[in-house]
Amino acid sequence: MANIKSKEKRILTNEKARVRNAAMKSHVRLAIKKAKRAIEEKNENVEQLLKDAHKVINTSVSHGVFHRNNAARKSSRLDAYAFKIQNKTAN
């Protein structure tokens, strides 16, 4: 354990941030999985789930959990996956 008071405070704040970031990352992963599952099952609320996933991803950027390029890559890959699956079933 740290001997300096400011270091003890940093340890506590780092732990709070770690827990908060882990929860947000989990929320993002879950939203992406839900959207992908809906795409694969050709669910009627795919558009809403994609919109929700993009919203969660963008929120994680504003909270500082992900870098904006990382979030853009996640969103782009999700959209590309949706486009690929929808075009595959259309043919």
From Swiss-Prot:
Keywords for the protein's UniProt record, in alphabetical order: Ribonucleoprotein, Ribosomal protein, RNA-binding, rRNA-binding
InterPro entries noted in UniProt: Ribosomal_bS20, Ribosomal_bS20_sf
Listed GO biological process terms: translation
Keyword Lipoprotein: no
Superkingdom of the source species: Bacteria
Name of a matching Pfam family: Ribosomal_S20p
Record SUPFAM superfamilies: Ribosomal protein S20
Example of a GO MF term: small ribosomal subunit rRNA binding
Signal peptide span: none
A cellular component annotation (GO) from this entry: cytosol
Family: Belongs to the bacterial ribosomal protein bS20 family.
Role noted for this protein: Binds directly to 16S ribosomal RNA.
HAMAP family: Ribosomal_bS20
Name of the protein this chain belongs to: Small ribosomal subunit protein bS20
Organism whose genome encodes this protein: Mycoplasma mobile (strain ATCC 43663 / 163K / NCTC 11711) (Mesomycoplasma mobile)
